[in-house]
Amino acid sequence: KIEIPAATPNGVRYALQTIKQLLPVAIYGETLSADENWSVPCTTINDAPRFGYRGMHLDVARHFFTLDEVKRILNVMAVHKLNTLHWHLTDDQGWRVEIKKYPRLTEVGSIRNKTMIRKEWDNYDTTPYGGFYTQDELRDMVKYAADLGITIIPEIDLPGHMMAALASYPELGCTGGPYEVSGQWGIRDDVLCVGKEKTFEFIENVLLEIIDIFPSKYIHIGGDECPKIRWEKCPACQARIQKLGLKDDEHGKAEHYLQSYTTERIEKFLNEHGREIIGWDEMLEGGLTTNA
């Protein structure tokens, strides 16, 4: 017989994966024959994870993965005892999550009209490309992952990497556009205008729907690769900088501190709703927030 002592249900899941690894590879097939006569050596295995966070990052903005493809990835993660999927749901190249308060995010922002071929900056295909997930589909995926012992952490990348959102709602940018969902890789100069209260209203409304879908403790807010070129010339952003008393110093420019203000404000909002933020390392620009 096989005995599995474990402190948690996930411990049992991981133990079962270990046992399966002792068996022939056919154990991972879609069907098993009743004639199989497998055995495992008599042994004791003491196993425990080295790291509490064992994750994978999945970017569905540049390349859209179908629901079945995402589930297959989750299945493979479970085999390898990974417990966290960092799901990158938005970027310049596409917005992939339904937000009911802002339907144009998927009506407009989920489709790009062209895509750069490889790294040839002047060479594009001419095929519209995109897709998105409904909120019901995402809730189903959260449950599917949880049944495998996997937590999904959603990422809404901001205030940069927001061309798909700006194409949908141009008033959220510093210049008013026109903008388009990006068909290029790399970094765009146009970002959310954080001098406007309307922008923070947008961010908070989006995050309210995100936390209603995803029960994870952490929400990833990006924070990376946010050029400050537009903020430097934007009257609304400069007015907020003046109002907050932000100034250039030996550690950074006032616009860097404006991003820090933005991060702190979003962090406070999510903390009030029982969540914590994660971001890319460039979120450090302008100083680290309290609980990030």
Identify the function of each model-found stretch.
Residues 1-201, 205-218, 265:
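Feature activates predominantly on carbohydrate-active enzymes
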